[in-house]
Amino acid sequence: MNTFSFTQSEQTRTELLHFIQNSLNAELWKTNTQAVNALKQSIADHALFQHPMLQKLHQCQLSLEQLKFIHLNYFTAIVKNFTDALSMAIYQACGLEKCPNIDAGKRIAAKIYARYLLSLNLMDELGFNTRQLEKSSAAKSHLVYFLTLLQQLNLDPANHQHTEPEAFALAQFIQKHINSYADLLLILACTELQVIKFSEALRNNMSVYDRLFTEGYYACHGIAEQGSAELANDDNHEDDIWALLTQCYSQENELHFTQL
């Protein structure tokens, strides 16, 4: 029996992704897919995802103080602002009505399919238990889970004394692109990949100090697994975002996306 929640359901996602792919002519979809795959590869090769810190985390070599430093800065840079960016991407999908890539007869509907797909991600973020809706709660949202984790670590998210300038710069960078649908998709895809790469490593190192640290936030991040009781689904969300970027990708903006 498939125990995936409906935000992980292949049937639901297949319907959405089928519409998205077929909203473009086959040749354009193929061309855009190649361009987006090149972007994905360049991101996968980025120094962030080859950082020696990953190995140290997997080997549980970081001290609790170092982990506190990471979490405080991660909160400012990404966690606090993630649903802002995701919600704005859902809104900015209105621009698909005028997207020249999309068949004219499908442009209005395209924004709904995009919003539905992105909303699967948002529902997970907001704390909906999509297997058992009665267990849903804003207290189980990823942001509130992270705030709880900070509290367990005796960290005050409002105290920026130990927050690095780079964390603020990243938050400002995301805000700078908040009105661009395509830019937000690329930023969100990168963020999902970062979550996939680092969540398991951080969870491993955190578990050395207290198993309690691995509950809540870290229990709902990672990849979707058949038969798992967890709601982790970041790999599907990342793939969905790449599909949406393929739909609206413009070859004229190739340099812009590469620089972004």
Regions found by a protein language model. Name each.
Residues 2-260:
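Non-heme di-metal
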